[in-house]
């Protein structure tokens, strides 16, 4: 639904009635119920999309549920690096719309819109104690910048030019998972991540194609930290306990 942040509707309910889980921890947007906590794709191991008939632990949704697990360490050390670069110079120039059947002043100006992004991911996983204690970790430095004109709503002409940028330590994603196989029937797992982002917004005057003085600014805080501790125990052939 493009009107609600391009979030997905599935399972027969609205976009605000889905739920998202990572390693059993609910990471749905708690303020609005829209979307999930942002995590780099490289951090994931498996995905499940449930649209009905799921157990009580997924009962906080009337729509669908996205259930995911992250990668874990194994008995072999593995390392990886991924670099993604999206320069604004490769984007097509936006259009300009004018009032009075194209003969009037500028109503919408997308020619100044731009987006650039640099995304680097480093990960490592392996045994801290062979067959017993395993670690997997990932860090993701991110650098983004976007500019656009803005008019308040779809019926108002553009009267502002905005620049939004996010970089540095306040925009570093990190995540990790620690698994302790106490014995073949009992496992203790600790999982944590931070997807905090501080976006610096600067607002400038805009009038009929001309960008003026800076008139406002703000720091937009997004994301945060999450962590969980879970236990899985096989008590008998017919009884498994998770907590």
Q: What are the residue ranges of the model-derived segments?
A:
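Surface-exposed strand-loop-strand hairpins of Gram-negative outer-membrane beta-barrel proteins
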Residues: 89-116
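Outer-membrane beta-barrel translocator domains and adjoining extracellular loop/strand segments
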Residues: 33, 91-98, 148-154, 195, ...
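Extracytoplasmic loops and strand-loop junctions of Gram-negative outer membrane beta-barrel proteins
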Residues: 29-30, 49-50, 99-108, 156-162, ...
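Transmembrane beta-barrel wall of Gram-negative outer-membrane proteins
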Residues: 111-199, 219-240
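Transmembrane beta-strands of outer-membrane beta-barrel proteins
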Residues: 48, 80-84, 138-140, 191-193, ...
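Periplasmic N-terminal accessory/gating domains of Gram-negative outer-membrane beta-barrel systems
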Residues: 1-72, 103-109, 117-123
């Amino acid at each position: 639904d493009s009107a609600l942040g391009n979030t997905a509707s599935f399972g027969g309910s609205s976009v605000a009635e889905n739920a998202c889980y990572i390693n059993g921890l609910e990471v749905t947007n708690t303020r609005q119920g829209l979307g999930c906590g942002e995590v780099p794709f490289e951090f994931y191991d498996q995905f499940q999309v449930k649209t009905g008939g799921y157990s009580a632990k997924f009962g906080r949704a009337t729509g669908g549920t996205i259930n995911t697990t992250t990668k874990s360490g194994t008995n072999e050390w593995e390392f990886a690096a991924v670099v993604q670069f999206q320069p604004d110079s490769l984007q097509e120039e936006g259009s300009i719309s004018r009032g009075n059947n194209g003969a009037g002043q500028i109503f919408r100006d997308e020619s100044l819109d731009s987006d650039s992004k640099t995304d680097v991911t480093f990960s490592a996983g392996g045994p801290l104690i062979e067959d017993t204690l395993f670690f997997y970790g990932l860090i993701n430095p991110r650098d983004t910048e976007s500019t656009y004109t803005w008019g308040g709503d779809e019926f108002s002409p553009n009267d502002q030019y905005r620049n939004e940028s996010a970089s540095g330590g306040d925009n570093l994603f990190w995540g990790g998972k620690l698994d302790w196989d106490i014995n073949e029937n009992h496992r203790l797992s600790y999982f944590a991540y931070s997807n905090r982002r501080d976006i610096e917004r600067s607002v400038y005057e805009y009038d009929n194609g001309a960008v003026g003085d800076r008139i406002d600014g703000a720091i937009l805080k997004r994301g945060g930290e999450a962590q969980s501790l879970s236990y899985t125990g096989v008590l008998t052939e017919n009884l498994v306990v998770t907590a």
